[in-house]
């Protein structure tokens, strides 16, 4: 007798567990400029990420080139912090001691003094003509075509402003007219005069406050711009002017380690000594640029490339760690005499002071790779005596303006403030998200229009979902049976989430993420439309989950601020939720009342009431940031939208209707012209149509048909056949015309 299964052995223990087949989760890879490839990202200590970013040199307004780097790094920082959940410690510097700042501060000070001195008109004319001599020499010596073109534009403007003042002086014009011409010349010649005044008097400036006022002002403007762009503030902000003692100590240790040398009160880094060291490599980022004297001299600064300065170096490839100050330059005490820091050493000393001997990430613009970042790496590794000061070097791509190179020195740039006059900070950020952070971004009307349309597309989806979620139901009514459409949409949702995660792991590929999000919304829109056709209510919980996820991703990217659960904030991130929850119940009541009135008005054909209802929808409520959408047979949809957005939509609609009407009128006018031309042609008798063309034909038969050309040669059979067809067509047209005349149907 066999045992029953209850008595069988081994049945009281669990069976072996069958593990699912799982694909290994992708890890985050970042494009590392040190290897020029995507590398798996591993912080050096647990989940903490130490990050240093090169900040601005503050001597002028921040422009879209700055925005390219700082918005892009802000996105990367937020993704690492809020998506991958790293503990990011972010340090950024402000360069407030630099050749550009010194020169600009001197020029601004001297030009302001010159303007305030109110020079006589004849003196101004003479000074501008004198300043033109070295300026024209500078143009002739400039090889860069873009820079040459910029200088020539200045020369043209100055020359155009010179002539009226000269003419007015020759004619003894009145004081008011002379003053007007002088002001025009002063404005046109500001760059030219500033250079000339600096050459004459720059060395006489000894007041250090002149060199601190300029960067202090522009740093303040920079922070305002970053706040307007919703860029996170750094955890630590370092200013060069506050770190001079640390920089001096940093330079001294490099000298002590044998990689620096003193020359005429300045200190230089020996690139040869460093490169020959067994444990070091010079120019890790761009080794092929070693010896590029143009790039090296740009890195040294305009005030540091004179013949006497360059002769102090042991090698042209060496660079300044400490610069002996000349007259007219700010200075600080050091073991080598009064001087100021070199550009590259500033970042090394400040970053080293905060982050130590090695950091996880260093970021900056693509154009900083050589010599700035390569020199940073060399001097820092010489100081710390290691070969890993930076583990991952990230460089944001260039920014072009409508396909053209952007350059502050070439005066071809758009300030951040100007850009924010045309588009919102969110739209700018969306434009950046729709492109790879490491590739060139073209800032153009097409680029921004794509971002605006993306924002509108997402916003309409969020507004539609919010409207669906507001439909009254009890809590159990929110949960309905899932049919095939819901299962398919949910599968699509999770597929898109996986694709988005994979894209973020792949060098934080926001471009792909944005496309996947757009595709997901398109699927949702198709689902909602299918439900509408079937006269079924869409699944709220599924749409809530998807829209909440999309909102959370846009929050990660910094495109949404505040506590908004679904969609973009309305009326500012702080009061968005309160505004919507407060006013929406009243708007719903108003909408329902309006719908009831419209139904009665339609039944009784009261057109005046229907017109008032349309006026409320089209003109009154948009002024308050409310959009009503009427759908035949369905409840009116109520949407809260920014007032400016609605008014812009209204204006665009008006322009579109005007354009449509203009095209309609143009088509009618063309049709009328064509009909008039046809009528005129119909009036011509076939016997006259060729006889008028004496430049082509010389002889005709009795019906007016041509037989010979202008030279008296008889027409060929082919020509005759072709002309006969035209003749017969005209016969038919003229016959129709005669019939119209007989019937009285022509004017």
UniProtKB/Swiss-Prot annotation:
This is Cysteine--tRNA ligase, cytoplasmic. ATP binds at residue 408. Binds 1 zinc ion per subunit. Residues 651-683 have a biased composition (Basic and acidic residues). One of its GO terms (biological process) is cysteinyl-tRNA aminoacylation. Its cofactor is Zn(2+). It is found in: Cytoplasm. Homodimer. L-cysteine binds at residues 55, 95, 372. Residues 1-26, 651-685, 700-721 are annotated as: Disordered. A motif ('HIGH' region) lies at residues 56-66. GO terms for cellular component: cytoplasm. A motif ('KMSKS' region) lies at residues 405-409. Residues 15-25 have a biased composition (Polar residues). Coiled coil: none annotated. A motif ('KIIK' region) lies at residues 100-103. Its main location: cytoplasm. It comes from Xenopus laevis (African clawed frog).
């Amino acid at each position: 007798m066999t045992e029953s299964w209850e008595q069988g052995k081994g049945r009281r223990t669990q069976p072996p567990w069958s593990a699912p087949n799982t694909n290994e989760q992708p890890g985050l890879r970042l494009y590392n400029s040190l290897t020029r490839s995507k590398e798996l990202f591993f912080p050096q200590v647990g989940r903490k990420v130490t990050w240093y970013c090169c900040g601005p040199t503050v001597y002028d307004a921040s422009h879209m080139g700055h925005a390219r780097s700082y918005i892009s790094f802000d996105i990367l920082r937020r993704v690492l912090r809020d998506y991958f959940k790293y503990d990011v410690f972010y340090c950024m510097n402000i360069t407030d001691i630099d050749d550009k700042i010194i020169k600009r501060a001197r020029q601004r000070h001297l030009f302001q003094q010159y303007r305030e001195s109110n020079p006589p008109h004849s003196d101004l004319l003479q000074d501008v003509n004198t300043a033109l001599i070295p300026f024209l020499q500078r143009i002739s010596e400039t090889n860069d075509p873009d820079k040459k073109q910029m200088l020539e534009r200045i020369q043209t403007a100055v020359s155009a402003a010179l002539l009226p003042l000269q003419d007015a002086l020759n004619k003894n014009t009145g004081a008011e007219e002379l003053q007007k011409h002088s002001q025009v010349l002063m404005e046109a010649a500001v760059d030219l005069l500033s250079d000339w005044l600096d050459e004459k008097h720059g060395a006489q400036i000894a007041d250090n406050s002149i060199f601190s006022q300029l960067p202090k002002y522009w740093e303040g403007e920079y922070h305002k711009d970053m706040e307007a762009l919703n860029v996170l503030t750094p955890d630590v902000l370092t200013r060069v002017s506050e770190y001079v003692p640390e920089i001096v100590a940093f330079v001294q240790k490099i000298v002590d380690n044998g990689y620096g040398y003193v020359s005429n009160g300045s200190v230089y880094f020996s690139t040869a000594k460093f490169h020959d060291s067994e444990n070091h490599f010079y120019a890790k980022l761009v080794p092929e640029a070693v010896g590029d004297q143009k790039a090296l001299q740009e890195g040294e600064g305009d005030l540091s490339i004179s013949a006497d300065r360059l002769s102090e170096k042991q090698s042209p490839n060496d660079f300044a760690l400490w610069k002996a100050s000349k007259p007219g330059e700010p200075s600080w005490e050091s073991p080598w005499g009064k001087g100021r820091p070199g550009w590259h050493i500033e970042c090394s000393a400040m970053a080293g002071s905060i982050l130590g001997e090695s950091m996880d990430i260093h970021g900056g613009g693509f154009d900083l790779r050589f010599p700035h970042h390569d020199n940073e790496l060399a001097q820092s590794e010489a100081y710390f005596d290691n070969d890993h000061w930076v583990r991952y070097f990230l460089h944001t791509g260039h920014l072009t303006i409508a396909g053209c190179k952007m350059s502050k020195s070439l005066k071809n740039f758009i300030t951040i403030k100007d850009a924010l006059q045309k588009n919102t900070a969110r739209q700018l950020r969306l434009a950046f998200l729709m492109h790879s952070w490491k590739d060139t971004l073209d800032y153009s009307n097409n680029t921004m229009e794509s971002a605006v349309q993306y924002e509108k597309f997402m916003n309409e989806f969020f507004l539609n979902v919010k409207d669906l979620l507001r439909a009254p139901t009890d809590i159990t009514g929110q949960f309905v049976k899932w049919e095939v459409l819901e299962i398919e949409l949910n599968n699509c949702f999770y597929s898109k989430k996986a694709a988005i995660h994979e894209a973020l792991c792949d060098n934080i590929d926001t471009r792909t993420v944005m496309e996947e999000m757009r595709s997901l919304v398109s699927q949702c829109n198709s689902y909602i439309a299918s439900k509408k056709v079937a006269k079924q209510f869409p699944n709220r919980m599924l749409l809530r989950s998807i829209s909440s996820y999309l909102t959370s991703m846009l929050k990660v990217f910094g495109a949404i601020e505040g506590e908004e659960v679904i969609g973009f904030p309305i009326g500012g991130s702080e009061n968005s939720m309160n505004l919507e929850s407060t006013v929406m119940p009243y708007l719903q009541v108003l909408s329902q009342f309006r719908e009831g009135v419209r139904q009665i008005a339609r039944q009784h054909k009261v057109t005046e009431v229907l017109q008032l209802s349309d006026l409320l929808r089209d003109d009154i409520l948009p002024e308050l940031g409310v959009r009503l959408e009427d759908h035949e047979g369905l409840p009116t949809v109520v949407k809260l939208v920014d007032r400016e957005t609605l008014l812009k939509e209204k204006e665009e609609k008006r322009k579109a209707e005007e354009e449509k009407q203009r095209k309609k009128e143009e088509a009618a006018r063309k049709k009328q012209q064509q009909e008039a031309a046809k009528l005129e042609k119909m009036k011509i008798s076939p016997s006259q149509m060729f006889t008028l063309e004496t430049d082509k034909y010389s002889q005709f038969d009795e019906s007016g048909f041509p037989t010979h050309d202008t030279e008296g040669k008889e027409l060929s059979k082919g020509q005759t056949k072709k002309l006969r067809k035209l003749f017969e067509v005209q016969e038919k047209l003229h016959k129709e015309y005669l019939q119209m005349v007989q019937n009285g149907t022509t004017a």
